[in-house]
Amino acid sequence: MESAAEKEGTPGGGSQRVAEGARPRPAAGGEGARDLDGSPEAGDGEERNGLAGTKTTEDAEEIKMDLAVVKQEVVDWSDLDSGVADSQWVKQEVEGGPEVKDEKGVLEVKQEADSSLVVKEEEVDEPEVKEEKVKVKEEVTDWEEVKEEDLTIKQELFVGQNVKEEQVMDAAPIKEEGSLKSEAMEDAKVKEEPQMNPRVGSKRKLALSRCETCGTEEAKYRCPRCMRFSCSLPCVKKHKADLTCSGVRDKTAYVSLQQFTEMNLLSDYRFLEDVARTADKVSRDTFLKRPKRKKYLFFMKNRARKQGIYLRLLPNGFSKRKENSTVFDHRKQQFCWHVKLQFPQSQAEYIEKRVPDDKTINEILKPYIDPEESDPVIRQRLKAYAQSQTGVQILMRVENMQQNMIRYHELDPYKSLSDNLKDKVIIEYPTLHVVLRGSSNDKQLLQVKSESAQKLGNGN
């Protein structure tokens, strides 16, 4: 049947196969031929009927089966080779046979007689591709080994953290021991505090004492100079005015050897250091090195000599030179003296500045001891002088004499200051000693009065 079909086939004697889904081509010159759709072919198509038609259908079915196998192999080959997958057609060669083409242009298959396909030969490369993929997997396994090494390193780091934790655990008991020691020290301090309480005794003594100015309130302050207790600022100011106290500690005050402590030694050392520093500062000061107004000082001496007063001036740096405020008034042609008043019975001392020389001594003493015109605070301080019935006596020490020979001039309270200072030696400014006349029981004052009276008698 196959030989008959081949004979009744195409004029070339070759068999014609159509791919699956492809339509057969019409034979050249055939009148009665038809295509797969049933259209009549050109030529004598009416003669081809019967057995030849059945054989062609069987051959077509075999061709379809072969094409199905080829199609499967083409699909597998397209997955491996990307270049062939992009193409939408396949050629299959057949020895000594014509090419079968699809009219729609879907696929062109070429098949050889021995049914050896080119596609099968190209599929041999597929295992090589798989082996390459296996190699890639082996490389990945190498990376996994590296990750495992990193994990071991992290474990070593964790071991170092454990060491730190052990150090922290070791340091914790040390801190606890330190806290116990600090608590023990605090307990010791608490126990020692009752022993330090005797220092508070001086504060308690100060609190129990009364104010020496008002006498009603408890004392809160103590003057570092006169050591008097005070309770408030008004009392402090009042005691300074009554006692003429500066409130500054006397650094040169006498301290007995029994009462001499390390604080006194430190005070003396600091005092000497201050003196040395002041002297060095003065020696470096260019302003102080300039010549003083010596002409004015000579003028003061000459004017005092014309009035019969022997004025002596001390060098710069002495306290009396700094305190002296005596000036000469050119308009009134008179001296304005710096006068110091001392009241031994009340242990008081006052200073009068710019006192005109034509003013009497009674006028100078009136603001101090006058019962009516004196200041109430000063009158209270000088109560012994204000209430005295015998009056007062004004004395002035004789200058330019030996220290063991104390002499005093007795001044007339009804004369002016210039008349009382006439024919006398004055060092910087006059100092008047106001004493009570009825205090003859005091030997020191008695000696002073006797010497002053003798001096006054010899002068007459």
Swiss-Prot record:
Give, as residue ranges, the zinc fingers classified HIT-type. Answer: 211-245
Q: Where is the composition biased (Low complexity)?
A: 19-28
Give residues annotated as binding Zn(2+) 2: 223, 226, 239, 245
Q: Where is this region: Disordered?
A: 1-61
Keyword annotations for this protein, in alphabetical order, are: Isopeptide bond, Metal-binding, Phosphoprotein, Ribosome biogenesis, Ubl conjugation, Zinc, Zinc-finger
Q: Which residues carry this modification: Phosphoserine?
A: 39
Q: Name one GO molecular function term.
A: identical protein binding
- The residues that the entry says bind Zn(2+) 1 are 211, 214, 231, 235
Q: Renumbered to this chain, where is the cross-link Glycyl lysine isopeptide (Lys-Gly) (interchain with G-Cter in SUMO2)?
A: 71, 101, 110, 130, 137, 147, 154, 164, 191, 449
Q: Which domain of life is it from?
A: Eukaryota
User: Which GO CC terms are listed, alphabetically?
Assistant: pre-snoRNP complex
Q: Is the keyword Phosphoprotein in the record?
A: yes
What is one process in the GO biological process aspect for this record?
snoRNA localization
Report the family membership: Belongs to the BCD1 family.
User: What role does this protein play?
Assistant: Required for box C/D snoRNAs accumulation involved in snoRNA processing, snoRNA transport to the nucleolus and ribosome biogenesis.
Q: How does it assemble?
A: Interacts with FBL, SNU13, NOP58, NUFIP1, RUVBL1, RUVBL2 and TAF9. Interacts (via HIT-type zinc finger) with the RUVBL1/RUVBL2 complex in the presence of ADP.
- This chain's protein is named Box C/D snoRNA protein 1
Name of encoding gene = Znhit6
